[in-house]
Design a protein with these regions (language model features):
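Phosphate/ribose-recognition catalytic cores of enzymes acting on nucleotide-derived substrates
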Residues: 104
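N-terminal, Lys/Arg-enriched amphipathic/low-complexity engagement segments
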Residues: 66-68
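Surface-exposed extracellular loop regions of Gram-negative outer-membrane beta-barrel proteins
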Residues: 122-129, 133, 288
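Signature for the C-terminal beta-barrel architecture of outer-membrane proteins
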Residues: 26-30, 36, 40-63, 73, ...
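Bacterial Sec-dependent N-terminal signal peptides
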Residues: 1-31
Length: 288
């Protein structure tokens, strides 16, 4: 069964490469991609706690992690996809990763003023206190947001973002309405040095930013009164002068009781400030 699934993964990867190769024939189109297959074979080594029983009750004698991804661009348009296979996941990776399929795909249009992306999105607001989606293949982590993102740049130095969608949770269906939450967020950032002509060449640098994110998830807990809409907001300031830099950010989130925090109804807060100095060959950062 594993061999057949692996063959299906390799065949699907080959078909993707062939199909995207045809698109690359279009003049001015660019295509790039990569693939990787990691494997482990396990042998009994009681010195590090690997026994016949642990192999039998664990993932088995071997583990395989594989992926292939393709990105295509033509003018203002870009698109891509990633196909993954865990047959089964290697030791140290979550067993819920086991499976084969198209894990990620997206299509995006950006003309400099407005950008629209449909599909799986990776982004963050500020330092990522209240919204951050990213993928780290070596750790088996991926919390991409499948939905829509719009970025609008009405004038020089001003960037507005809006996102909407559902986050990836292993191979769980995005269509599930009760078990999957919907994430909605907006973010704005104003770079004063770009917006104000008198500050274009100034040694003093300043930017302001703010975000709001809400999560909706139906309450299916028969015991606790869980809020279905949970909101969080964030504000940040970045300042600099010459070789010095200062940044501060504050985030607040209303109560979000769940099994992960033992159903506490306390609100959450986060604060980060940093002072930095840098020159050629030397740099220092102080953070609180």
């Amino acid at each position: 069964m594993i061999i057949l699934t692996m063959k299906r993964f390799l065949l699907s990867l080959a078909l993707v490469l062939c199909a995207t190769g045809l698109f690359a024939q279009i003049e001015n189109a660019q295509i790039n991609g990569s693939f990787q297959i990691d494997g482990q074979y396990y042998q009994v080594d009681e010195g590090i706690g690997i026994t016949e029983e642990s192999i039998k009750n664990g993932v088995g004698k071997f583990g395989i992690n594989g992926f292939g991804k393709i990105n295509y661009s033509l003018g203002n348009f870009t698109a891509g996809l990633r196909y993954e296979a865990y047959l089964p996941p290697m030791s140290g990776f979550d067993k819920r990763l086991q499976g084969v399929g198209l894990a990620n795909y997206y299509a995006s249009y950006d003309n400099g003023t407005i950008s629209v992306t449909l599909g799986d999105i990776y982004d963050q607001f500020g330092n990522g206190f209240i919204f951050r989606t990213y993928e780290e293949w070596s750790l088996g982590f991926d919390n991409s947001l499948r939905g829509m993102r719009v970025i609008y740049r009405p004038t020089e130095g001003v960037t507005l973002k809006a996102v909407y969608g559902k986050q990836r949770y292993y191979w769980s269906s995005y269509a599930a309405t009760e078990s999957r939450g919907v994430v909605r967020g907006i973010d704005g950032e104003w770079d004063l040095n770009q917006s104000i002509s008198a500050m274009n060449d100034s040694k003093f640098r300043a930017s302001l930013g703010g975000s709001f994110v809400s999560k909706y998830q139906k309450n299916t807990n028969p015991t606790y009164n869980i809020p279905e809409n949970v909101g969080a907001f964030d504000g940040r300031i970045n300042l600099g002068y010459g070789r010095f830099g200062f940044t501060t950010e504050y985030a607040y989130k209303i109560n979000d009781p769940s099994a992960f925090n033992n159903y506490t109804y306390h609100e959450g807060q986060a604060f980060l400030s940093s002072l930095s100095y840098s020159q050629k060959g030397f740099g220092v950062i102080l953070q609180v």
